[in-house]
Amino acid sequence: MPPDRLEGVALVTGGGRGIGASIARELTEAGMRVAVTGRTAEQVNAVADDIEGLALLGDVASADDVGSWVEATERELGPIELLVANAGMGAGDSASWDMPVDDWWRVQEVNVLGVHLSTRSVIPLMLDRGRGRIVITGSGSAYLPGTRSTAYATSKAAVCRYGETLANELAGRIAVFHFSPGLVRTEMTQRFDDDLPWTPPELAPQLVRVLASGRADALAGRYIHAEHDDIEDLIARAGEIAADDLNSIRLRR
């Protein structure tokens, strides 16, 4: 199947580097006008220049900054059709009891509060217009047992549940997706060993492109993995997936 062609405006938080930058480029190639956000001017401006998009600076954990991003995007580019809540941070390898409390909490502010501030800023606008989609970048840390980084694992587990609950709240009005990009080589993961099962970097942007198209709306609220799931297969089996409650994180007894 040829790649989906898209239109409209997308806001990609954390779009100045890594997975976010790749998503911004993919959406631009698909036909969308894209605004990218971040804290490092050099990175954000470079991506915005590359895609002929809009660069927005600030902190995703600041309600004022996020609100200004949404206002600027709608003023400069038009109504936001797609939010990609991608901004996030890692937590290093410090033992949980050695990690300063403020550092531990900062991970929650960026990875959890940042997602909430982003979604709550666009949802009223999308509801008023009767259209829109939200894609939240998660992690396998939401469900895989780990041996380090309680800060990161906690934040991603929270975002996973947040995404599913939000999808249920908005069912039939706005499609909300939560996906894992896999283990992608980025600035955040550069300290990891080379022999780990790295995910091809193009898979996450390609998945987001499909989610933005509307073809996968029946999968809203489901957990989707960029590498381990075949999105076209999931779309074809959407009825079965809903009936059997697949692609979900549950307590089984």
Give the predicted meaning of each segment.
Residues 124, 168-169:
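Alpha-helical segment proximal to the catalytic Tyr-Lys
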Residues 119, 155:
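Active-site helix of classical SDR
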Residues 178-179, 194-253:
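C-terminal helical subdomain
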Residues 57-69, 101:
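The beta1-alpha1 cofactor-binding region of Rossmann-like NAD(H)/NADP(H)-dependent oxidoreductases
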Residues 97-116, 131, 135, 159:
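Catalytic Tyr-X3-Lys loop
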Residues 14-18:
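Conserved glycine-rich cofactor-binding loop
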Residues 90-105, 148-151:
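Conserved mid-core segment of classical short-chain dehydrogenase/reductases
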Residues 139:
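Residue(s) in the substrate-gating loop at a strand-loop-helix junction
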